[in-house]
Swiss-Prot record:
Cofactor note: Binds 1 zinc ion per subunit.
Protein name: Neutral protease 2 homolog MGYG_03465
Species of origin: Arthroderma gypseum (strain ATCC MYA-4604 / CBS 118893) (Microsporum gypseum)
Gene Ontology biological process: proteolysis
One term under GO cellular component: extracellular region
């Protein structure tokens, strides 16, 4: 792929895009109720309120088994920082093990410890709530066909800080990791070379370069193509557009160097976050990005529209880092149809919208130039 030449042409791309239909979305299909079942233990009861079977994908929802951001935790009106992981999952060839099947009016319960992903050692009164989008497939299928939004009740909890402090953090650093990370920060190192072999270092550096060029091109396209911006971010509001452009420019700057920046990048995992289907993940509390083994199975840069590759995965993860752009992006939805179904306020704060927009600009250009 002649990437530089293609991106040079991208700056002139202003052709309007055809309208894309929304994926079906239902705001009343899934009900989520939170209850306290211990000092910092929360039980989520998820109920299918519809009249047909729901096959619900667990990734980055309140049903996710990984230490992802399932709830928002507030104390005195201020959100308690999240200390868990923000992963990007491999979304192709999904299998049944990653879905939860619920008949009509049936419920499933999922229990998790909020102290494992939040520092609650201060103790006292906290308010917990959950909101998100569940990708759904039809019964006996793993093809995502719709999305169900959910908003939970507000749960008020009185937390014993001493007990909360005794809960092990899900993404806790080992002494070795603490030392490596401290040295990297002291040297302002972007890629931690000790986490890489020759092949993974080359791939990661290549991904950084491609991420920088993609983000730059997407920033230009955001200002030049209002139809495309509306398609991916659900608005053409001037303030929202400026936020998106600023975030893409920040990602481009952060991606432009392998040995300086505000994030620390690991070619391999030593914290146990590379669970099944995780391509890469970010710890926003530490501005740290980790590539997983299957990241290196992705193509460096794909021509396939809305497919995943190394470059857009790196771009996706950088949007999760508050040092790159604040507020950092969340994982409200995955995949093109789900992302363009988000309301505008969430679309401009959703990491995959940025990755898809960057990929879509490049992919659409190939179609445009080859036709």
């Amino acid at each position: 792929m002649q990437f530089v030449a293609v991106l040079a042409a991208l700056g002139a791309l202003v052709a309007p895009a055809a309208a894309y239909p929304h994926a079906p979305m239902n705001e009343t299909l899934v009900d989520v109720q939170l209850t306290a079942v211990g000092n910092t233990m929360v039980k989520a009861t998820i109920t299918n309120k519809g009249d047909s079977v729901l096959n619900m994908l667990q990734f980055n929802t309140i049903m996710d088994e990984n230490p992802t951001r399932k709830v928002m935790v507030f104390q005195d009106g201020v959100e308690v920082p999240f200390t868990g992981m923000m992963p990007r999952y491999l979304m192709s060839d999904l299998t049944e093990e990653f879905f939860t099947t619920l008949p009509p009016q049936a419920s499933v319960e999922h229990t998790f410890d909020i102290a494992a992903t939040h520092d609650l050692s201060a103790g006292g009164k906290y308010v917990i709530s959950a909101s998100g989008a569940v990708p759904t497939a039809e019964e006996h299928s793993t093809t995502i066909t719709s999305t169900a939004l959910y908003e939970s009740n507000e749960l008020h909890m009185e937390v014993d800080g001493v007990q909360a402090a005794a809960v092990e953090q899900a993404m806790n650093f080992t002494p070795e990791m603490q030392s490596i990370h401290a040295r990297a920060l002291e040297k302002r190192t972007k890629i931690v070379s000790g986490s890489c072999n020759q092949n993974t270092l080359r791939a990661t550096m290549n991904a950084l370069g491609n991420s920088a060029r993609l983000a730059q091109a997407a920033s230009r396209a955001a200002s030049q193509n209002p139809r495309k911006f509306q398609e991916y971010f659900r608005t053409n509001d001037a303030n929202a557009k400026q936020r998106v452009i600023a975030r893409l420019n920040s990602v481009a700057r952060e991606s432009s160097s392998a040995n300086a920046g505000v994030t620390t990048y690991y070619c391999s995992d030593t914290m146990g976050g590379c669970k099944p289907r995780v391509l890469a993940y970010t710890l926003p509390s530490r501005n740290l990005v980790v590539n997983c083994p299957i990241y290196y199975n992705l193509p460096p840069l794909t021509k396939q529209c809305h497919a995943q590759d190394q470059a857009t995965t790196t771009l996706h993860e950088f949007t999760h880092n508050p040092a790159v752009a604040s507020p950092h992006c969340q994982d409200y939805a995955y995949g093109y149809q789900q992302c363009i179904s988000l309301p505008a306020a969430k679309a401009v704060q959703n990491a995959d919208n940025y990755a898809l927009f960057a990929n879509g600009m490049l992919s659409n250009l190939f179609v445009f130039t080859l036709n």
